[in-house]
Amino acid sequence: MERRTFLRGAVIGTSAATFGGTLMRGAAYAAPAQNGPGPYGALGTADANGVQLPSGFTSRVIARSSQAVSGTSYTWHNAPDGGACFADGTGWIYVSNSEINPSGGASAVKFNSSGSITGAYRILSNTRQNCAGGATPWNTWLSCEEVSLGYVYETDPWGVNAATRRNAMGKFKHEAAAADPVRKVIYLTEDESNGCLYRFIPTTWGNLSSGTLQVLVAGTGTSGSFSWSNVPDPDGSPTVTRDQVSGAKRFNGGEGCHYANDTVWFTTKGDNRLWQLNLANSTYELAYDDSLVNPGAAPLTGVDNVTGSSSGDLFVAEDGGNMEICVITPDDVVAPFLRITGQSSSEITGPAFSPDGTRLYFSSQRGTSGSSSGGITYEVTGPFRTSP
């Protein structure tokens, strides 16, 4: 397998390396990632919030489903899922999807420069099973419906402009989105056991009202070269998008997606893999596969949402597993970064860093109750590294 290039940069959202166009410097990245000691050391005992963290890190709960967000009158949504952060003057905004059907959507929490909550509000309503999504360079949040023939909705993190359904981005079981400001495209994962990876090329970059939907075409192996082919009917009817192009590569349950200059990473839950597209030479390969971890048991299972930090580390959330967010370093080590205890019927969702990279936001979708009304959204603060 060829060596990979892991590209570093500031990340301010679930899928962006960035969506703001920050370029990343390269480093050799051998593959696949293997079990080893993480850069932050061992996890400590669970804190008052039930979160095990490395030394120097602390957690706080910023919102609970069905309860008013602290300091506001806004009731936080059920089943919090994918999320991203957006700079807002000296503060920032964290947006979060609601993965329920019907009456899904997305909400936002606003913070000032000291991290205090200053507001919370709805940015999308009455949609279905809003799972993950992605930020854009023009500071909107793409909220994806994880239902058959689902849509992508473009939303305003400030809640000023009405959300817009982006039909041209295709109707399928959407999961996540990642914008590539260099090629001016948006990559889209599909949560089907025989799903595909797509890219959307807007007619005009910054305007998602029209454009071309393409699907990745490649062989059946875990590495090789790839190309893109137009999807004839993005509407997906009568033939679903994944069955319209001969040779479209199949992926077992597409989940999170993350772009860093010239590289796309995305997870597949059906086989616990993290894939990598090397855009500069149009090749693909595995960045992680839990069945290839040696020695010892794989620390990362139930792969789901993925984001990155300014050090070049990837942070991958578990759907189930033992409720961890694991870190994959540029030198191919995978290790737990945090673990949530007492919530075995939940999953971790929506990891996203604040614009300055010092705070990590995420949710436990069903919390201690195992119910969508029991979701908990967290913030972790600490000495996140800025270089490998």
Language-model features: locations:
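N-terminal export signals
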Residues: 5-28
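Loop/turn-rich, solvent-exposed surfaces of beta-rich toroidal or solenoidal domains
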Residues: 269, 296-333
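Blade-level signature of beta-propeller repeat domains, shared across WD40, Kelch, NHL, RCC1
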Residues: 352-388
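Beta-propeller domains
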Residues: 50-78, 86-121
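Blade-edge beta-strand/turn elements of extracellular beta-propeller
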Residues: 48-65, 111-124, 154-173, 209-210, ...
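Beta-rich, blade/repeat-based domains predominating
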Residues: 74-89, 126-137, 171-185, 246-263, ...
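Conserved beta-strand positions in repeat-built beta-propeller and related beta-rich domains
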Residues: 94-102, 143-146, 188-191, 266-270, ...
